């Protein structure tokens, strides 16, 4: 039995398209309450839905600049930025944002897109914190008291001193070896702290709990095996001293060590946190510290209503355009136009299915790419039908006219699509953001368009001829 490979491939693609688009269709038909619940519960189905970009769904766009001035060598800079991206991704995953887009741009910039996020401020706090956690003993020596007196006398902040210590030689002269000065969260208390004995790299877990003397919210931290040993050693050797917990250069708390804290026991960070602050702090500690400081240099927020408006307008304009094209093809080319309409429909369905399966994000420029793809597909079908009309005009039978039409037009269609595909690949390689979205949808669409225009329509003609359902073509 001879296998019809064209039919097998077409049926397989159709089955694949139904499977790939079913989660998106199911999600689209949900009520707003169910959609929100699915996103909160991180329903696995969401991982298979067609992703919408910021301009369609709403959300936040952030552009971060990494400070790599202290690093020497391009390899070190590249590695630091790559690790920063990975840590930011881990933090965002803990924040519960579905399908964020995080990418490197240039040598030191990081682009972040968070579709559908409802709290941009919390996201910025989560992403922007360096989250360098340190444990330092509070120095209470006479030299430390002199340092604090001089800082108060000169009316400078600890940050000003640390950033330019050479400008204050009198303070530097009495500063205990290896120590530095820090301020508290309230900016009211200053501390002279010895060198860091333990860092956040030794953490195994961090979570929000209620506790403390007044039942306030705090972040409970658990050390890994090596960190537990070091922490036990620190507390054993420094009973009666204050242990400052420092996060990004700010003293969160400085409790007095009353007794040795054994391995396996937890420490806690208390700092008059509200619920959101505590959650963000726990998340960044779990994800780890950024290898380089980052600075927010651009922020854009698209409201959900604007995204919904874009979807509605884009959907309606696309629907009207497609219906008009379908009607024109049917009226002008009759039954052959109807066959072309089937190919156009399959083109759109397969294209959307591939995008959903490959987890591409659909944006407004992407919608423009789809529109251009459909236009190219219409153009290909028009070329085929006009050529068939010419063959019929010279007296050929319907089947011979169709065979000749496809044979003579194939390379014209191929050349047009291939040259456009080359342009799309250049756009993808050198473009950024929206341009890449346009290039991706256009590239996939062109390949699918070639298949539907040349293979699917020919397959339909062959079926109709075989069943004697199409004896004469009127174009």
UniProtKB/Swiss-Prot annotation:
It is found in: Cell inner membrane. Disulfide bonds: none annotated. One of its GO terms (biological process) is protein transport by the Sec complex. Its main location: membrane. Keywords: Cell inner membrane, Cell membrane, Membrane, Protein transport, Translocation, Transmembrane, Transmembrane helix, Transport. GO terms for molecular function: protein-transporting ATPase activity. It is a multi-pass membrane protein. The keyword Zinc does not apply. One of its GO terms (cellular component) is plasma membrane. The chain crosses the membrane at residues 7-27, 313-333, 338-358, 364-384, 410-430, 437-457. Gene3D superfamilies: 3.30.1360.200, 3.30.70.3400, Multidrug efflux transporter AcrB transmembrane domain. Belongs to the SecD/SecF family. SecD subfamily. Part of the Sec protein translocase complex. Interacts with the SecYEG preprotein conducting channel. SecDF uses the proton motive force (PMF) to complete protein translocation after the ATP-dependent function of SecA. Forms a complex with SecF. Part of the essential Sec protein translocation apparatus which comprises SecA, SecYEG and auxiliary proteins SecDF. Other proteins may also be involved. This is Protein translocase subunit SecD. It comes from Endomicrobium trichonymphae.
